[in-house]
């Protein structure tokens, strides 16, 4: 078995080298700034340490993940990254998993052409979901990319069939147990492969049955995952939370099936129309026209049986649902982190170009996708630069705030109860206007809300402070309404034994 593995790796040497080098190059150009600077902010501030108490959940970051149904996320972190957010190491781990996922995808579709390998790596690495993760959710970046890898491997083992397909079940449990939305990667790749097989004139019945087999394996993985989630929560004395996009929130709304389907398709379509950077809309519009031409050429193939054409059409209609299944399961609510699979539509276009074998069309699509990747690289670096500027500005502000507290007579660090009211009033710079639309980047400071002060003092300032709870803070806001805002004189006051500082 070992000899067989080394023999396989030897045959894969060139493809592996291309994939890893391309992923590393794309990753460093697009996200290197985020990996090399301490731009930890938003949720990655509140979950910097795996076992730290959180501001918006009465428990640790690990318990929060488990309550969301991501019970394998803490396990992954302890096995690979450790208990803290380490930007450079997390980034390198993420690129490693992305490279392996791209290689697995290449094996799935038998991609050996160097140009297509490079584009596959670019699509997996330089997309807005990875950018949002790096900018504001760095604590989840490498774990989520590991979930992508598990989803790709699940599709590979499904394709192999025989006893290997049983490995699809635990791999999907891993995917769901780290980040549920990455299940869409598995669904998308299965649909891609079914479409390509139908184009190659494989029997529609055979493809249909294989598709049902993929659904059955996914259902089995989902059942095992759900049962394990309940068991883990029961053993740890936790309840599955209905907050955010956790498992307990699935299909709990009052929306009907038709309403959910509409929301799912619309959120997928609008992703390519309204998501920043806005220039990508033009490229997406041209790619849509190219896709129509490709489909016309494919459906014009006389040798292609009618059942195949009908099944291809059905799969294309279902593709947005598969890529955005999280929206359907989450009552129509979805954000950028949950839409990683949507960007794989670029890969499908290139695979169709390879099948049609029209050089002009292939070059046209490559140019457009290349422009999208370039636009994403530029956008990600703008966002990381903005985050770094805000990091430094916030550090300066909070250093002065800490000094103001320490100069107040009677204040004892770590013992006196403190209430900091409001957050920084940094102005949004018009040059960064589109970056504020990205999930997690809408706030002009690493301290997104008042619930993040505890994390900031412990993570960045490493200064002891005893902050009051949110209920007490809201009570004090009314009593401190007439206080001037920092740094004006009189911005601090003692109210019922609590030192209050009004920031804004």
How would you label these PLM feature ranges?
Residues 41-43, 48-50, 56-85, 211, ...:
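Membrane-lumen/periplasm interface segments of multi-pass, membrane-embedded glycan/lipid transferases
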Residues 66, 70, 114-159, 177-178, ...:
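Membrane-interface micro-motifs in multi-pass membrane enzymes
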Residues 122-123, 303-328, 370-371:
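Transmembrane alpha-helix segments characteristic
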Residues 151-165, 197-204:
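Membrane-interface transmembrane helices that cradle and orient dolichyl/undecaprenyl
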Residues 165-166, 288, 354-379:
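Signature aromatic-anchored transmembrane alpha helix within multi-pass, membrane-resident enzymes
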Residues 165-180, 185-186, 191:
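Membrane-interface alpha helices of multi-pass inner-membrane proteins
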Residues 186-219:
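Perimembrane helix-loop-helix junctions
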């Amino acid at each position: 078995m070992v000899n067989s593995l080394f023999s396989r790796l030897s045959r894969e040497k060139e493809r592996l080298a291309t994939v890893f080098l391309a992923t590393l190059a794309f990753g460093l150009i697009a996200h290197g700034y985020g990996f090399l600077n301490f731009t930890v902010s938003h949720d990655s501030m509140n979950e910097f340490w795996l076992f730290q108490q959180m501001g918006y959940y009465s428990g640790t970051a690990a318990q929060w993940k488990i309550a969301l149904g991501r019970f394998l996320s803490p396990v992954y972190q302890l096995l690979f990254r450790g208990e803290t957010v380490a930007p450079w190491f997390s980034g390198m781990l993420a690129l490693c998993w992305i490279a392996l996922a791209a290689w697995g995808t290449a094996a799935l579709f038998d991609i050996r052409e160097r140009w297509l390998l490079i584009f596959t790596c670019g699509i997996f690495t330089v997309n807005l979901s990875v950018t949002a993760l790096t900018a504001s959710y760095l604590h989840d970046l490498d774990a989520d990319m590991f979930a992508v890898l598990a989803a790709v491997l699940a599709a590979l083992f499904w394709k192999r069939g025989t006893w290997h397909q049983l490995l699809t079940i635990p791999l999907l449990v891993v995917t769901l147990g780290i980040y549920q939305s990455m299940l869409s990667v598995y669904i998308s790749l299965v649909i891609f492969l079914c479409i390509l097989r139908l184009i190659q004139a494989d029997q529609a019945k055979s493809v249909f049955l294989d598709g049902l087999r993929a659904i059955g394996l996914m259902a089995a993985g989902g059942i095992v995952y759900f049962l394990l989630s309940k068991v883990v929560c029961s053993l740890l004395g936790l309840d599955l939370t209905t907050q955010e996009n956790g498992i307990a929130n699935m299909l709990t709304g009052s929306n009907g099936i038709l309403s959910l389907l509409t929301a799912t398709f619309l959120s997928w379509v609008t992703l390519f129309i309204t998501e920043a950077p806005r220039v990508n809309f033009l490229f997406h519009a041209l790619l849509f026209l190219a896709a129509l031409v490709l489909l016309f050429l494919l459906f014009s193939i006389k040798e292609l049986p009618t059942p195949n054409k009908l099944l291809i059409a059905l799969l294309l209609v279902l593709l947005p649902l598969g890529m955005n299944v999280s929206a359907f399961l989450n009552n129509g609510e979805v954000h950028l982190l949950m839409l990683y699979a949507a960007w794989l539509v670029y890969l499908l276009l290139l695979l169709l170009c390879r099948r049609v074998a029209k050089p002009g069309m292939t070059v046209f699509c490559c140019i457009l996708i290349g422009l999208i990747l370039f636009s994403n690289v530029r956008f990600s670096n703008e966002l990381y630069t903005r985050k770094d500027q805000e990091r430094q500005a916030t550090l300066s502000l909070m250093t002065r705030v800490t000094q103001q507290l320490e100069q107040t007579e009677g204040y004892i660090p770590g013992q006196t109860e403190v209430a900091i009211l409001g957050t920084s009033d940094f102005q949004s710079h018009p040059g960064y206007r589109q970056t504020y639309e990205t999930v997690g980047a809408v706030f002009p400071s690493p301290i997104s809300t008042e619930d993040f002060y505890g994390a900031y003092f412990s993570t960045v300032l490493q200064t002891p402070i005893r902050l009051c709870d949110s209920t007490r803070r809201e009570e004090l806001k009314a009593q401190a309404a007439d206080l001037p805002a920092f740094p004006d004189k009189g911005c601090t006051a003692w109210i019922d034994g609590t030192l209050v500082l009004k920031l804004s």
